[in-house]
Amino acid sequence: MKSKTIKKDDNNNNNDILAKFNNKYHTEINSNTFILDISQKDLDNEGLLLLSEVPLNLFDNVIELNLSQNCISDISPLIIMNFTNLKNINISKNRIENIDAFEKINLYVLETLDLSYNKLKNINSLVKINFANLITLNLANNRINDINALEFMNCPNLRSIDLFNNEILDISVFERINFPQLIQISFAGNYFNHEIIKNHDIISNLRKKGCNVNIYGTIKQIL
């Protein structure tokens, strides 16, 4: 198969796109960027789409992506940005309702995923992802009412999961999960009766396994 020839005009166009993005959002993104921090920039769906139009190899070295505190509701442009080495993703404090795009992104080396303060109602899309190295999962302050998908998630190294302040009624899935490294969970701020559940067998069994279960507050992130 013939390799694609990159014309001078293509390079100029790519540079123009990147310059346009950097100027608009006051960033300094270049080919040496390891931490892609575009937090608190009023970045919206249109801006994220613009960023996805820059050269694919621009993101080869990125290990941390921070898009927190913006106005994003659609993360599908991330699919074509060719991230291969991401260890940390923070998309907290946006307007995200759908995370199906994560199914098509290489998250094999990912260690931290922060989706807190969004509008998620379920986490079903996460079942299809191989989170072989995920350590911390923050789902706090969403609208999640069903967490049964946790039973089918592949997270052999998951140590912390924050479900603080959602709409969860049933935590029976924690009788069936297989997270051998899990050491802390927060269920606080959900729709069940916390006084009743604090002595529930599920909570007791998790604690017997060495897991710190918090039913009254959020938890400190491990990473």
Named regions from a protein language model:
Residues 2-6, 33, 180-223:
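C-terminal capping region of solenoid repeat domains
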Residues 15, 24-77:
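LRR N-terminal entry segment and analogous cap-like coil->beta motifs
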Residues 36-38, 62-67, 86-91, 110-115, ...:
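Conserved hydrophobic beta-strand positions in leucine-rich repeat
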Residues 41, 70, 94, 118, ...:
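Conserved "Asn-ladder"/turn position within leucine-rich repeats
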Residues 49-58, 77-83, 100-107, 124-131, ...:
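A structural signal for leucine-rich repeat
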Residues 111-153:
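Eukaryotic tandem repeat interaction scaffolds
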